[in-house]
């Protein structure tokens, strides 16, 4: 026989007014915050990824591949110094 954990049943939680008062504000707020985070470009700055127009510069049109196993640090330094 299974025991009782003392938690409220899920059906009671999602049918309560308090749940929907809280979540009717938080769910849209999280969506809007995420949309602003991405659309303003802050996500690119926080995670350090290049913006779509920065993948290829006018000077460097080739794909920056690391091909050497033992001199990868030197290759990486050459690629990043041109950025």
Swiss-Prot record:
Q: Which InterPro entries match?
A: PSII_cyt_b559_asu, PSII_cyt_b559_asu_sf, PSII_cyt_b559_CS, PSII_cyt_b559_N, PSII_cytb559_asu_lum
Keyword Heme in the entry? The reply is yes
Which GO biological process categories is it annotated with? photosynthetic electron transport chain
Q: Required co-factor?
A: heme b
By its UniProt entry, which Pfam families does this protein fall under?
Cytochrom_B559, Cytochrom_B559a
- Record note on quaternary structure: Heterodimer of an alpha subunit and a beta subunit. PSII is composed of 1 copy each of membrane proteins PsbA, PsbB, PsbC, PsbD, PsbE, PsbF, PsbH, PsbI, PsbJ, PsbK, PsbL, PsbM, PsbT, PsbX, PsbY, PsbZ, Psb30/Ycf12, at least 3 peripheral proteins of the oxygen-evolving complex and a large number of cofactors. It forms dimeric complexes.
Q: What is this protein called?
A: Cytochrome b559 subunit alpha
């Amino acid at each position: 026989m299974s025991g009782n954990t003392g938690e409220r049943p899920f059906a009671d939680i999602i049918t309560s007014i308090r749940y929907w008062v809280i979540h009717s504000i938080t769910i849209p707020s999280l969506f809007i915050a995420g949309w602003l985070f991405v659309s303003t470009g802050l996500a690119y700055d926080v995670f350090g990824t290049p913006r779509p127009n920065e993948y290829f510069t006018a000077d460097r049109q080739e794909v920056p591949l690391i091909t050497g196993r033992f001199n990868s640090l030197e290759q990486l330094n050459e690629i990043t110094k041109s950025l």
